[in-house]
Amino acid sequence: MAKNFKLPVQIIDFIRTHHGTTVAYFFFKKYTDLNPWDTTKENEFTYPGPKPFSKETAVVMMADAVEAASRSLLKYSEESISELVERIVYLQEQDGQFSDIPLTFKDISDIKSSFKKRLSNIYHVRIAYPERDY
């Protein structure tokens, strides 16, 4: 569809790689809960890829996953946001999604710090201001 609309190749790259070869875990978990005897279908719930192949496509993958997961937080605090970002990026790293990219530990640390700051700004809790009498 992106090619039909003549989107730039860089945008198409982001579209193709933003899920990499990850498992659509929510749907896979639902399936295995309903079919506990069938553990052979994980590949049917796995995105075809490719994995991110540039720092930029890796950042988009991380941002997409972190933003989506942040919507399911029950409580927004610095701690819950930090734990979420750490967990999501750790799982992507462990899954080998960044194996084709020269990301350094510093790169990943800087990216996670940026996400934590941005999400904290988005979800910050304001104090309730008292009503003014006019």
Task: Label each PLM-derived region with a short phrase.
Residues 1-134:
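Terminal helices and disordered tails flanking the catalytic cores of nucleotide-processing hydrolases
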